Amino acid sequence: MKHTTLIRAIALAMLGVLAFSRAAAAQPPDAQGVVTVLVTPRPANTFVAAQALGAGVDGLGQGGVAKAYTPVNLRAMRSAGLGALTYRLRTELAVEAWHWNPSGHWSEGAKAQGYWTSEALAGAPISTCYGYRLPRRGSTIDQANNDGYSRLDDGDARTFWKSNPYLDRHFTGEDNAKHPQWVLIDLGRRRPVNAVQIAWGTPYATQYQVQYWDGDSSGEDAHSIDDTFGDGAWRMFPSGAEAEGRGGLVRLRLAAVPRSVRFVRVWMTRSGGAPVGTGDIRDTLGYAVQEIGLGTWDGRGGFHDLVRHTPDGKQQTPITVSSTDPWHQAGGRDPNVEQPGFDRVFRSGLANGLPVLMPAGVLYDTPGNAAAELRFLRARGYPVTRMELGEEPDGQYVTPEDYGALYVQWADALHRVDPALGLGGPSFQTAIDGWVCWPDARGDRSWLHRFLGYLKRRGRLADFSFFSFEWYPFDNVCAPPGPQLVLAPNLLENALARLQQEGLSRRIPWLITEYGYSAFAGEAEMTWPGALLNAETVGQFLTLGGSAAYLYGYEPNVPIHEIEDCPTWGNLALLLSEGAGRSPRPLAAYYAVRFLTREWAQPDTDKPQTVYRAKSGLRNRLGLPLVTAYAVHRPDGQWAVLLLNKDPKKAHPVTVRFQKAKSGRPVSFSGPTDLYQYSASQYVWHPDKAHGYPSLNLPPRHLQASGRPLMLPPFSLSLLRGPVAGLP
């Protein structure tokens, strides 16, 4: 999940606070708002509810899979009414190889090590599967449990980082200079640097540069690797180029006078390979480094290392790498990362008999393991029509060209098994300001534009049949949620517009494969803000032409504390876990989902439902909506209008009208109209750290609308549904 910086999140929250401070002047307390549904000749979108309103299942902690997939939990999950399912791949975020079948084959079978391929033949049921840690890991930080460490500064000369062999010209068919591999060191603050020490492994780089980040035009220092994607530049140290590297222990004096730098990277463009006869060709490809140091030479020729060397990811100097070799060993199973087994998922009933959007491990896996996965699913007879390749390559700092090169190889392997299989991705993390990377030679920083360009140059754009991304818009779970919610529609609309500007075709499906309030745990997720954001995300995404949205947090869960300097507890969850054998309690998010699956969209039908745009007159002086609306015309002929009041303190009256044409007279609901409302009258969250619970927990109220302006309670969901005379 791509995280905006805290500064950006605070800025957005401040903008929202300003919006709310001006709202009173813009909208008197007794002002009536008008919501107008624009009944245009062509609807904004068409969808099938079971296919468009979905959820995701993910990897869990130790013992978590068996605890989550109990009969009582599965009944509660299915009762939310969600249809399609996507399988999320936590092992890919953990920098681990995925053994989706515990049975399989090692490339070095006698030693139970090497490159793994799970067994494709259907055998015993698979209930749980695991990730395996990579002993050639280079990055300190990962996006899962973050309990690993880099081998580049672990202080052990016997270990080493090695880049992914599938990015070598042997597999890509391209010159290695087109897929430079790199190591980036973050010193934490500006430090004097004029020397580097590299203990090369095998294979080593024969051509490389040592570069430093020079900052952007604002004059502000970069605080993370993400900040180096701005308009600054990587500059080579005066003596930072090596054109004829010979491996071994190398000490380079980079400059006569130390430079004050924070970020330094080693940029590798040519490999010396490994000696012939070393066995598996993959062991001979790429680059390997045993240990790296960075610092200064003193006047007596001594090297003063600024890098902290320890096998502890919390203590060592943070390092990020371009890729990692998926070679591993049988003893590397991570007990803290479990994935639900395929048989457990497909037999759970959660997919409702629909095709499941399945992943293939890419960044830390092999094409053969992906092909075996597909053969297994076909042998079992499980419905799979699409596979998502990898997870969050952008958040793991993989360049678009490297991901593209892997994508093409995986597409070849999978299409040899099933030429009709739909492939897509890249499962972007959330990026409020766009998905960017270091600029290429043309200055292009757009991750998506460059990925699409790579596929086009390779003649492989047809292999990209759907686009997927995640949407968690609010990093700052400590900020007041009301002001943030007001910003939500603009954030999503701008993100989608940017994607189209960068070349993403509207002719392929766009999928939100995870959505929720935040990538971080906070109380907002357990109560109204999370419920409202979820409903808004689905309604707006479908209105803007999206194909499907998959909720994250399907499994029952409990509040957790994640942000050290903020006393907030929460989680992305529909249901509050009550322990073994007990029915989980529904949360606000659960009832918000049922608003969509049971009342807004017509349930239990595979007929298409049409979405129409709706505009709200309840806006503040900045033009930001206090009330938003999403309208659907159902197969049963009824119109359903979902109304969200994102004002945490004030109720707002609204009148819903339907405008068939600009010159036509607005019409209203004309027959018996159902009203559903869900607000603080039905749900109140009692915060108590890990033991928080709903102190009031009732389903939405249902009554007949009176025909008068409808009063929307503060922080509430409302829905009007009925016939409209003169409209089909």
What are these regions (language model features)?
Residues P29-L134, G273-A274, I281-A462:
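N-terminal catalytic cores of secreted or lumenal carbohydrate-active enzymes
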Residues P367, E373, P400-Q540, L544:
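Noncatalytic carbohydrate-binding groove/subsite architecture in carbohydrate-active enzymes
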